[in-house]
Amino acid sequence: GYEEIFKSNDITHYEIIATSAFRDTTNSEEARRYIETAIHHPLRIISGLEEAKLIGFHPQASAGKTKLFVDLGGGSTEFYFRQREEIEIRSFQLGAVRNMLKKDEIEEWKRLEAWLLSIKPVRKLTGIGGNIKSFLESQNATSLKIKDFNERAGQLSQLTTKKKILTYQFSPDRADVIDDALK
């Protein structure tokens, strides 16, 4: 399990956290206790803003002048915007699973749009998280221009879930939601 991996990499201090799915469920406390018992380690449920703040630990977050990072999860999307020494973090209740289930709220999309229009335009957006990592790996790329990204995401969306699993070795859960994550 995770403990062996941590030991083999000399990791002695760690924290296990839960994000949007735990924040939004009605039985989060019961689920948290169940998991803690199963893994013999505390599990902390963090806020969306705390989740966004963690993006600051990304190796590229402190380099350069203006940076915008986005972490699109299943239930929420976090942004970390850095302009010189000024940092803004935001969390929106917009995620791949919410999108797939048509549970995104139009007001939340409007909040996101207003915030994006309020910040300095950026030339490069850095996506982090499982969906973008899986997508880029499937394209044998580490970055894409927006035109290429949209074109390749469109091509991927034409494949069935089964074909995505067979062609790109996506897990069933990833293959099921990746199109909604890339929209």
Regions found by a protein language model. Give the residues of each.
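Helical "lid/coupling" subdomains associated with nucleotide-phosphate turnover
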Residues: G1-I11, T19-T66, F81-K183
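Conserved catalytic-loop position in the HRD/HxD motif
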Residues: D71
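Acidic, divalent-metal-coordinating active-site segment for phosphoryl/phosphodiester hydrolysis
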Residues: G75-F81
